[in-house]
Amino acid sequence: MNQVWLISMAVGSTKWLRKLALLLSLPISFISALGLRPAQAEQIGVIPREVLFGNPEIIGVSLSPDGERISFLAPHKGVLNLWVQDLIDGAQPRRLTNRTDRPQDPAFWTPDGRYLLTSRDANGDENTVLIRLDPVTAEAEELTPGEGVLAGIVALDRRAPGELVVGLNDRDPRYHDLWVLDLESGKRRLLHQVEDGNQVGAAWLDNAWRVILRKRIAADGGIAYDLRLPESKEWRPFLEFSFEDGLSGSGPGSFERSGTWMYGTLSTEGDLPRMVRWNRETLKTCELNCPYELVHQAESGSMDIGLSDPNTLLPQVLVETDLRSRKLILDQSVAPDLKALEKLAGSRQFSIVDQDLEGDTWLVVFHSDRQSPEYWIWKRSEQEALKLFSVQPSLDQYQLAPMESLELKARDGLRLPAYLTRSTLADQGPQPLVLLVHGGPQARDYWGLNPLHQLLANRGYHTLSVNYRGSTGFGKAHLLAGQGQWYAEMQDDLVDAVTWAIETGIADPERVVIMGASYGGYAALAGLTRDPELFAAAVDEVGPSNVETLLASIPPYWEPIRKPTERMIGVGKVDLAEISPLNHVDQIKRPLLIAHGANDVRVKLSESETIVQAMKSRGLPVDFLVFPDEGHGLVNPRNAIAFYGVLESFLSRYLGGRAEPLG
């Protein structure tokens, strides 16, 4: 179909959907196309898009410092707003915001519980304004400048509950200077002005708001850290890391509350990270390569702090994540609590997402691949659990598909951790497959409830997500194997995964679609231009089509990470024009669906417009959706529901699955 459909989507408007439904819909006998028994298809109901991608009943829960209240997001007149509720029997929630256009951002409490802090931007432009909310009166006050300024919360401390350290790029859009903000008056004072690219992170302030660490990125992408303890007047070199070690997570963290130990992560002597700590007395005199103590060596995947003592700030629980996650206890005082929560979780996993100032009340989320997440309260002193909410309870009435963890191999032997969700409609035999590519590309896919996997499984498609080389979370070698491999070995990994699915009888070789957002969208475009015979169609959401223009238009505040980004892409070593799908449009033979937010500052709308125009001029089939009130991704559930409605019809047309009607 040689036609472009440019759709500007107004919130609440469905006329364009009905019109598009007439264009996209064809009579489809999906039962015969998928080899299903009619009774089987009838028994498994269609999960509505509204259930999968609409507003959750509740999400973004935060526990007050005294453990007696929660804030959360819940719908009001169809839009997520912020609410607060006391944790006592019979207490009713009270709404604090009145957003009518775009979902409210989550909030969290100041250390004294006096205020809630939240944020907003303008339709996805990422110019974030910080907002102070009174949880009693609902009075709101903007704390930071608006237009053209990206504000971020850097630090809060219980010993200075009336203050907040924020980062603002109002002086120079490339860099975030640090300011101490008075929460009552809104007045601010300069704490640290970035000079020569020296950046300061959240963990690198002491309890008197003094900067003790700074970092700078070298010309080759390496990272250097300088240290200045409060008792010293001069900065001196502390740590230096190569580009490879810095990219894979090596760096200092923060002091625990007594100031005796500074914690950090190193990946300098192996493939997997290790947690270390430096003694303050040693730091007073050493320079570079200071001796440290080993806290824990990761055995697989990534390593994060899962729980810290709120009084001492010492890490209590570590979480290692490979294909699945596991917890490691550093502080045995919490062992009985974790054992009780594991018993309560059953086959599910759980995360401790918040706690009160005394560490007695925990906010816990239980989650799995086939059940709506649940928020619970765990009282340590009483060893009792209280269920608060299910995020999307209506989802639990439908048959959901399990997510399988896989160990695939690339053609050069590299391990490819992957996840497969099989169609809930399929009998034995090859089925249509959607290869869903994650963005980043320095990111990863995880095991768990994935609404898009569930949508596709419910409509009759297998879905495969692959952690290709360059993904994070699977060791330094796996990450660095992606260096300079856009349009090359990173794409080979995706092709190898599809080949495996075909050779094992999982995928129908004539019905494979590649789909993704951001870098995943780029990979979808690369799939159509580099391997035009392999994929029946492609779906690109906010993906770049031209690597040269992508790098030329990155936001100013990305300048500090420009060099590492360019090194991973391979600037100076690879032909950027050659790895840009736009320059291979003449190779496209299959249909393409593109969606983009008009306010995207990371991947400009022009990245999609140019390839659409190039395809249109050649009479190639492309469907193009523009969302005027979105940025880099679809935040508004109404837009997400609309997009996935178009996606369903697109896939049904080219793969033969079923689809919930549009409109």
Could you say what each language-model-derived stretch is?
Residues 39-41:
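Boundary at the C-terminal end of the N-terminal hydrophobic targeting segment
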Residues 468-663:
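Active-site-proximal cap/loop segments of hydrolase catalytic domains
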Residues 20-33:
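Bacterial N-terminal signal peptides
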Residues 43-76:
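Mature N-terminal segment immediately following signal peptide/propeptide cleavage
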Residues 73-96:
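Beta-propeller domains
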Residues 1-17:
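N-terminal secretory signal peptides that target proteins for export/translocation
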Residues 54-59, 77-82, 99-105, 110-417, ...:
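Peripheral, non-catalytic segments that deliver or gate enzyme domains
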Residues 394-510, 517-518, 523, 551-560:
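Cap/lid segment of the alpha/beta-hydrolase catalytic domain
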